[in-house]
């Protein structure tokens, strides 16, 4: 089996690329970073530090790399069995034209073996969005052929990969946590379902997408925002602060009650999932900066994201949300000189006041009880 993976950054190398290579798949990375491309093609291998209770170093070998903006990547799309991405939500639109060209070439060459494309991004149904961009870039006479022979498979991914602090200045070395989860929608594949260790198949993807968003992402963000307010540097420092831990755990339990109502998750298993996530935040090997995790507060306070979406669920089912409100209030206090969204948030609150600002960012009714609760909590933190 041959695969092409867009994005040779830390997540690409440390998570998806590693799983594919470990499964014995012939893997080529596509990227724009020439330093990384040259290093991969010189060595055809790299090291991954896997850190949890202990630390181990795995070597990923037998890999190649091409530029994601040249002809080589188009040629590969015409030949491979699987295309994956870890480029960030914004970049999906930029790689779509190359994918479209590759699919046209595949059609012209008469290659009708099934191709599956999986975007492994921190977003909901990212592959469906990528498909829209690819379809827009395709000529009309290729669209029906692509619909027949190419599967666009949505996925949910979860692994903490902090920015590398390699002591060796090796551009390929990467550190990842032990935990990883890659869940894919098995109803969207063309041809036989792949057997890749570490890839989990489901016919109910949205349940797992929301489980991750409402638990890992909600908890991570609230830990960062409360941690920043309390003067902590890292996620580990913050979660070891008992006051912060109580709110974070409480918020994940509140969002968990929504998941249990909505999807029928088992309450005991979900409690164990929450405990596992708290353990991940405590990982001493992950130097995960609260400022990095907290960045882009406007996006994180938007209606479909990790703070407001679970809150809306508690309103839908009439469930408690005191700790989620604390997290939202802390997010409104997030300030960072390096983050344009943090500066925009501060300006918005200074201009409109916290009530109108939160309503504008989140889509919540300015006169609603929850906005009033959040503003009260926000003022209590000043």
Swiss-Prot record:
Its EC number is 1.1.1.17. The modification N6-acetyllysine is found at residue 269. GO terms for cellular component: cytosol. Keywords: Acetylation, NAD, Oxidoreductase. The keyword Ribosomal protein does not apply. It comes from the Bacteria. Belongs to the mannitol dehydrogenase family. This is Mannitol-1-phosphate 5-dehydrogenase. It comes from Escherichia coli O17:K52:H18 (strain UMN026 / ExPEC). The lineage of its organism: Bacteria, Pseudomonadati, Pseudomonadota, Gammaproteobacteria, Enterobacterales.
């Amino acid at each position: 089996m041959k695969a092409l993976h867009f994005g040779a950054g830390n997540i690409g190398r440390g998570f998806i690329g590693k799983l594919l290579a470990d499964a014995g798949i012939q893997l080529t990375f596509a990227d724009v970073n020439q330093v990384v491309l040259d290093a991969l093609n010189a060595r055809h291998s790299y090291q991954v530090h896997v850190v949890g209770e202990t630390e181990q170093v795995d070597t990923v070998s037998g890999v190649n790399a091409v530029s994601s903006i040249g002809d080589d990547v188009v040629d590969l799309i015409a030949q491979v069995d699987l295309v994956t991405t870890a480029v960030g939500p914004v970049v999906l639109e930029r790689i779509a034209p190359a994918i479209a060209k590759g699919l046209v070439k595949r059609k012209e060459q008469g290659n009708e073996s099934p191709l599956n494309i999986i975007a492994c991004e921190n977003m909901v149904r990212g592959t469906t969005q990528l498909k829209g961009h690819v379809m827009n870039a395709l000529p009309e006479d290729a669209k029906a052929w692509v619909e027949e022979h190419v599967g666009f498979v949505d996925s949910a991914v979860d692994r903490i990969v902090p920015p590398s602090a390699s002591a060796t200045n090796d551009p390929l070395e990467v550190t990842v946590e032990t935990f990883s989860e890659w869940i894919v929608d098995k109803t969207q594949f063309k041809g036989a379902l792949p057997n890749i260790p570490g890839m989990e198949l489901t016919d109910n993807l949205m349940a797992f997408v929301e489980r991750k968003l409402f638990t890992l992402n909600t908890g991570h963000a609230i830990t960062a925002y409360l941690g920043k307010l309390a003067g902590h540097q890292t996620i580990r420092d913050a979660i070891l602060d008992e006051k912060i831990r109580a709110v974070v755990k409480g918020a994940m339990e509140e969002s968990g009650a929504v998941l249990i109502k909505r999807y029928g998750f088992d309450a005991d298993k979900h409690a164990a999932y929450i405990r596992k996530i708290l353990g991940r935040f405590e990982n001493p090997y992950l130097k995960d900066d609260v400022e990095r995790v907290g960045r882009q507060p406007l996006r994180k306070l938007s209606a479909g994201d990790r703070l407001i979406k679970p809150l809306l669920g508690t309103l839908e089912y009439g469930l408690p949300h005191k700790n989620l409100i604390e997290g939202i209030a802390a997010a409104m206090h997030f300030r960072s000189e390096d983050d344009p969204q943090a500066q925009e948030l501060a300006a918005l609150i200074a201009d409109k006041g916290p009530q109108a600002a939160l309503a504008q960012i989140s889509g919540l009714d300015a006169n609603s009880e929850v906005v009033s609760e959040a503003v009260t909590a926000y003022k209590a933190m000043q």
